[in-house]
Amino acid sequence: MPGKLRVHELAKQLGVTSKELLATLKEQGEFVKTASSTIEPPVIKKMRAHYEAKGGEDKAAEKNAPAATPASASKKPTEKKPATAAKPGPKPSAAPKPGAAPKPGGAPKPGGAPKPGATPKPGGAPKPGAQRKNTEKGSERAVTPRSMPKPGGTRRVANNPFSTGSSSDRPSPGPRPGGTKGQRSAGKPGDNRGGKGGARPQGDGNRSGGRRPSPAMMPSHPNPASMPSKAAGSGGGGRGRGGRGGGPGHGGPGHGGFRGRGGRRGGTAGAFGRPGGAPRRGKKSKRQKRHEFEEQQKHEVGGVRLPDGGGKVVRLRRGASLADFAEKIGADPAALVQALFNLGEMVTATASVSEDTLQLLGSEINYEVQVVSPEDEDRELLESFDLQFGEDEGGEEALEKRPPVVTVMGHVDHGKTRLLDTIRKTNEGAGEAGGITQGIGAYQTTVDLEDGPRTITFLDTPGHEAFTAMRARGAKSTDLAILVVAADDGVMPQTIEAINHAKAADIPVVVAVNKIDKPEASPDKIRGQLTEYGLVPEEYGGDTMFVDISAKNNINIDDLLEAVILTADAALELTANPDMDAQGSAIEAHLDRGRGPVATVIIQRGTLRIGDSIVVGDAHGRVRRMLDEFGNDVEEAGPSRPVQVQGLNGVPGAGDNLLVVEDDRVARQIAAQRDARKRSALQAKARKRVSLEDLDAVLKETSTLNLILKGDNAGSVEALEDALLDIEVDDEVQLNIIDRGVGAVTQTNVSLAAASDAIIIAFNVRAEGKATEEANAEGVDIRYYTVIYRAIEEVEAALKGMLKPIYEERDTGAAEIRALFKSSAVGTIAGCMVTEGKVKRNGKVRLVRDGNVITSDAKIESLRHEKDDANEINAGYECGMVLSYPDIQVGDIIQAYEEVEVPRD
């Protein structure tokens, strides 16, 4: 197969012009722009075959044309006799009359050059040298397009390359044989008179020879009696140029230049698939019927027609946009934007939309919108990578027993950390700021019991109310919970919250009644209080084990551990497959200055080894190093083992799932998709709904406190953020957390704070490097905290300080108008007697008449005692004053007051 060629090169090989070849390519469906465009080998082969077949047809047409075509054309005048027949046998020098039929045997003279518009006479083939060169080209252009096969058997209309219909139902006429109707005679050289019914070569070829006729050259109408009657469908006579063929069945005596009335014309197909001509009558097409049916089924919302869901369920991810919703239901996103605007919500098509907004729009068009939960969304993501989380691989024979994971929960300062210190024989609580736990600690301890050593994994969760989310994560990651309640304090709010977390996680609870060594301890009271919350002691006929202990004096600690083991063995089947790829949960994560991101994880199933590719939430990496709770290196970690993992590219969120994947590429893709979905969800959550009603209020200036949060671990930052966002002061001020992160305060944080006028809250971290110098230079305020509730209190105080002050009116005195004096310089002067307190110059006053307040914001513009100006007048003295309110009368009471700022609670 030949290589690629340009259009003009192939045209030269085929012996045609580039214009003709371009037209042929378009007819064949190959849309080529210019003659310099290249053509693929299959198209070249197709064009060669087309022109080879066309060449054979042209040769056959040339062979049959002199004999067949003129004979058939000259046969028509002989069938119908004219009213006045032409005389046969004209002189050789005389031109034939317009109505005379040519003789079949007549041939043109060898030396005679026919007119450009003349065609060969019947019976003789024209010689190649008898016509001029441009005439041959014009004839070739005129004949060639008609000899080409057209798609669909019709000719394209005018210059519309997309049309496939003809301009009329009649066939396009070919070149007429000369002499059939009023052929021009080779008259005198000076004879410019237009012939009667002169013919012209039909087609798209250029006009050759002859001058353009003028009105003086117009011939008079011929006598119809002297002309042969036309056959139906023949062309009318021409005035200087040939008439066009008339429609079939409507021929008549031709008048110069007018075409015969055609039959019913078919509509021409327009460009780009639009139907042309008059609309069709009759039955509608299936497409039209289906389109009309779909339009009728659409639901109108605020003037916008949208598809009616009919109660269908649409599942959308968190933070989905209107474009995602439109893709699900097959609608135009712009239509959804307009519909939501008509409902009072202003949202763009690509912005993340809240769940409430999506459900509101779905209910309007009869769709039930279900926002996929984070768990389902993550499961679908893992399934797309052929991964599963939460199931052991293999059969029951692959499962082995694993140690229980126990969470110690309870109210703040009830002794949870002291209990763990006693079990581990360490002093963990001494290192906590303020004596309260502000992170989750994970430890594994071996306990010597009567039946041998047993391993237990402990999780210590914070008890402060700000750490609700951390306690919930601790409950979800554990098998059993120890509820610590102080015997001298009783059930407290965080105690109840811990019970609810345990019930939600469906885990058994062992109650440790602590501090029984104190004189005011009352264990029976604790048992009675917990019975109200569903924790019934065994001695009361329930199924909850209660153990009275003293963590400080190491009383009954072994009994508590034995109760934990018994409960785990009786109520739980703790097994896992250690031979599969590791799966676990991140209990805590922080950014270490020397080691980078460090995540504390508990392996739930499988075994984690050095070098494994892991993904933890939106962080991924390869396990570079693992440490246990004592700082020792660990090569591999089995089920229920807590370890610190290094090697991640970022700090994961507390509670994120850990998963070992095939390679780093898969881990990176999963982490990237999780990060994108997380950002979309946060945008939808942070976006404030703006309705048309409160648009003016939103546009007004409001006081906003911008904060940047930095902490030592992800859980503390999350707890601090939730606690700060829960502060309710007033709608006049807003709290905006523009950034959050784990690790020391950096120069990037300071630059962002300077650009956004924000305050940096540093929790258990300090500024590093030149961040402090830059903060001092930029005037950025960095607040350092080690106890969370102090940060909450100061931020709340700052928000209250941003509130607009409230002013209270306090009366300072009163005066009665006794007389009025007119002055051209200052207006009306009120002669008054101060009856109470005192009045001051430029002070605010109320004007009271007959017990009604006439105005409440008047002002004393001038104050005099006799002829002297005075700043204030006390009770019992007369004075003259000029008020800013001129409509005053004798007997009016002037009440002076001042506005005093009132502190806001």
From Swiss-Prot:
Residues 410-417 are annotated as: G1. InterPro entries: EF-G-like_DII, IF2_II, IF2_N, P-loop_NTPase, Small_GTP-bd, T_Tr_GTP-bd_dom, TF_IF2_bacterial-like, TIF_IF2. Residues 280-290 have a biased composition (Basic residues). It is found in: Cytoplasm. Residues 63-75, 161-171 have a biased composition (Low complexity). GTP binds at residues 410-417, 460-464, 514-517. Residues 50-306 are annotated as: Disordered. It holds the Pfam family GTP_EFTU. The keyword Thylakoid does not apply. Keywords: Cytoplasm, GTP-binding, Initiation factor, Nucleotide-binding, Protein biosynthesis. CDD domains: IF2_eIF5B (cd01887), IF2_mtIF2_II (cd03702), mtIF2_IVc (cd03692). It comes from the Bacteria. Residues 550-552 are annotated as: G5. GO terms for molecular function: GTP binding; GTPase activity; translation initiation factor activity. One of the essential components for the initiation of protein synthesis. Protects formylmethionyl-tRNA from spontaneous hydrolysis and promotes its binding to the 30S ribosomal subunits. Also involved in the hydrolysis of GTP during the formation of the 70S ribosomal complex. This is Translation initiation factor IF-2. The gene is infB.
